[in-house]
Curated annotation (Swiss-Prot):
GO terms for molecular function: metal ion binding; protein transporter activity; unfolded protein binding. One of its GO terms (cellular component) is mitochondrial intermembrane space protein transporter complex. It comes from the Eukaryota. It is a peripheral membrane protein. InterPro entries: Mito_inner_translocase_sub, Tim10-like, Tim10-like_dom_sf. Belongs to the small Tim family. This is Mitochondrial import inner membrane translocase subunit TIM9.
Length: 89
């Protein structure tokens, strides 16, 4: 995003707003991951420790989620690049 038309104070404010929004998005993503993997993997509530199966499930769940997020991010970047090329022509 181009903030060059704003003065220094406005640029700083916009940067803080964007940073706050990014942190909120990250926390929402993290909370969703925790909830999804907990609901899918936590089965035995008789112990504080995770079972071997639960540990494996959590690892697989987080790996799958992160790979999916990476793929979505890559597709978004590709789409953004196409949009920028289309706007430049």
């Amino acid at each position: 995003m181009d903030f060059s038309q704003f003065n220094g104070a406005e640029q700083a404010h916009m940067s803080k707003v964007i940073e706050k929004k990014q942190m909120q998005d990250f926390m929402r993503l993290y909370s969703g991951l925790v909830e999804k993997c907990f609901n899918a993997c936590a089965q035995d509530f008789t112990s504080k420790a995770l079972t071997t199966n639960e540990t494996t499930c959590v690892q697989n769940c987080t790996d799958k989620f992160l790979k999916h997020s990476e793929r979505v991010g890559a597709r978004f970047a590709e789409h953004n690049a196409e949009q920028m090329q289309g706007a430049g022509q």
